[in-house]
């Protein structure tokens, strides 16, 4: 009797350590500028997306991953995906960002709970959550850090 192993699905990440040209994120304005491009202008008011920016110990943005894309009123975020990519790219911190298609920048209770859940999970691996931002077009955003919620 021979045993066969079943291949498991895996997340593939291209890792290129030469990141001298990667931007350094020093504040919420810079985070907004670099993360907004992952929210297409023609759909930012149509469907909700959740993306994570991954940073190294020098706060250089080493990558961005779209965790989920949902509908008009929400999206589902799997914390395991957030962490699995962070571990694969050896991130020391993360920036969380999502949009509200309604244009309302105030965080919902679900947004606050998700932030807490991700922060607690990241803490187990010594990964910092630098901010969770709710983005809109035209230079508008809500920062959990600036509002004292992180």
Model-derived features with residue positions:
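Glycine-rich, small/polar surface segments that engage phosphate groups of diverse ligands
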Residues: 19-80, 85
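Active-site-proximal loop/helix of nucleotide/amide-processing enzymes and allied scaffolds
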Residues: 1-17, 56-58, 73-150
């Amino acid at each position: 009797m021979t045993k066969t192993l079943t291949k498991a699905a895996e997340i593939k990440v291209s890792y290129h350590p030469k990141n001298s040209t990667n931007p350094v994120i020093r504040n919420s304005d810079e985070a907004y500028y670099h993360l907004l491009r992952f929210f297409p202008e023609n759909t930012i008011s149509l469907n909700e997306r959740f993306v994570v920016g991954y940073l190294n110990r020098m706060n250089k943005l080493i990558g961005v991953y779209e965790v989920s894309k949902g509908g008009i009123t929400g999206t589902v975020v799997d914390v395991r995906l957030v962490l699995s990519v962070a571990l694969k790219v050896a991130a020391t911190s993360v920036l969380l960002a999502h949009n509200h298609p309604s244009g309302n920048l105030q965080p919902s209770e679900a947004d606050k709970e998700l932030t807490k859940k991700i922060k607690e999970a990241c803490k187990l691996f010594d990964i910092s959550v630098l901010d969770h931002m709710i983005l809109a077009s035209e230079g508008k955003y809500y920062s959990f850090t600036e509002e004292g919620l992180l």
